[in-house]
């Protein structure tokens, strides 16, 4: 995936050194965009092996509207554990905003169910948007993630903030706006997750595949990832794999892990790097 390596190289070569919330420090740029034609293959990074199981289970967890880590840990996915309470709670994070956005009358709005119906019935609408950015529920930076959850707020603010679908020539495209992007550890997950989500929505709405467009706000490399970045940039991308989805599934909320099969995934060895909390 040349697009991903180009992003990494661009930030390494032109970015500005900045302090950050974690105290690690970053090299950062503001504003960058990548585009992937989903008809050309599934955009899973090949210059290091990625853990697809975690990507799929996390996406299904979002779509379930869940905000407790139980489903994830039951399926061997621990990527959210550092921020959860002892009970596994994360507060009103992505799943809650996608499926249960709070309304002024004390009720909730299922953004995703409405989105799918709107794409089916009004494909040319410019309102195919889902937002996870709810200012009233953002965490207090001076409080631990766990205490924020106890206060009824998110453990972490959403990094992948807002996404929009677009229909043209019977093809479905998706654009993600990501306000904050950990390029080495997080972005490969984000690309694959939203590419897969686009494929799922296309299937249940009867559309063909268009593009996944990934737009960044603060795109950064952590300073303690720079050695790993050099290792990855020295590797040649391999051919993209193919993602097969069970064609029988017609309801966006009915997908299961077993409905996905990655075919012909060739990748260079995994590269370990510390996560900044």
Swiss-Prot record:
Binding-site residues, dUMP: 21, 126-127, 179-182, 190, 220-222
GO cellular component, as recorded: cytosol
Alphabetical UniProt keywords: Cytoplasm, Methyltransferase, Nucleotide biosynthesis, Transferase
Cited Pfam families: Thymidylat_synt (PF00303)
InterPro entries: Thymidate_synth/dCMP_Mease, Thymidate_synth/dCMP_Mease_dom, Thymidate_synth/dCMP_Mease_sf, Thymidylate_synthase
Class in the EC hierarchy, top level: transferase
Active site: 159 (nucleophile)
Statement: the UniProt record of this protein carries the keyword Cytoplasm: yes
Amino acids binding (6R)-5,10-methylene-5,6,7,8-tetrahydrofolate: 51, 182, 276
Catalysis performed (reactions): dUMP + (6R)-5,10-methylene-5,6,7,8-tetrahydrofolate = 7,8-dihydrofolate + dTMP
Gene Ontology molecular function: any one: thymidylate synthase activity
Membrane-traversing stretches: none
GO-annotated biological processes: dTMP biosynthetic process; dTTP biosynthetic process; methylation
Subcellular location: Cytoplasm
Pathway assigned to this chain's UniProt record: Pyrimidine metabolism; dTTP biosynthesis
EC numbers: 2.1.1.45
Disulphide-bonded residues: none
Main location: cytoplasm
Complex and partners: Homodimer.
Function: Catalyzes the reductive methylation of 2'-deoxyuridine-5'-monophosphate (dUMP) to 2'-deoxythymidine-5'-monophosphate (dTMP) while utilizing 5,10-methylenetetrahydrofolate (mTHF) as the methyl donor and reductant in the reaction, yielding dihydrofolate (DHF) as a by-product. This enzymatic reaction provides an intracellular de novo source of dTMP, an essential precursor for DNA biosynthesis.
NCBIfam families: PRK01827.1-3, PRK01827.1-5, thym_sym
Family under the similarity heading: Belongs to the thymidylate synthase family. Bacterial-type ThyA subfamily.
Protein name: Thymidylate synthase
Source organism: Saccharophagus degradans (strain 2-40 / ATCC 43961 / DSM 17024)
Gene coding for it: thyA
């Amino acid at each position: 995936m040349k697009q991903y390596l180009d992003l990494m190289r661009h930030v390494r070569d032109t970015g500005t050194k900045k302090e950050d919330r974690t105290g690690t420090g970053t090299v950062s740029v503001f504003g960058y965009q990548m585009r992937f034609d989903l008809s050309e293959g599934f955009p899973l990074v090949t210059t290091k092996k990625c853990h697809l199981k975690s990507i799929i289970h996390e996406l299904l967890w979002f779509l379930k509207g869940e905000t407790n880590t139980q489903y994830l840990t039951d399926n061997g996915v621990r990527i959210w554990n550092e921020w959860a309470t002892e009970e596994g709670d994360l507060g009103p994070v992505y799943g809650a905003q996608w499926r249960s956005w709070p309304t002024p009358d004390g009720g909730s709005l299922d953004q995703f169910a409405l989105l799918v119906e709107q794409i089916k019935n009004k494909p040319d609408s410019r309102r195919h948007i889902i937002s996870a950015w709810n200012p009233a529920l953002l965490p207090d930076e001076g409080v631990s993630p766990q205490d924020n959850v106890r206060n009824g707020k998110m453990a972490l603010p959403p990094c992948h903030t807002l996404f929009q679908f677009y229909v043209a020539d019977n093809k479905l495209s998706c654009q993600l706006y990501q306000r904050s992007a950990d390029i080495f550890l997080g972005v490969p997950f984000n690309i694959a997750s939203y590419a897969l989500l686009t494929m799922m929505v296309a299937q249940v709405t009867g559309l063909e595949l268009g593009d996944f467009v990934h737009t960044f706000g603060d795109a950064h490399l952590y300073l303690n990832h720079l050695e790993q970045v050099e290792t990855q940039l020295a590797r040649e991308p391999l051919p993209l794999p193919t993602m097969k989805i069970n064609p029988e599934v017609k309801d966006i909320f009915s997908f299961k892990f077993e409905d996905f099969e990655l075919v012909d995934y060739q990748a260079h060895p995994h590269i370990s790097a510390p996560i900044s909390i």
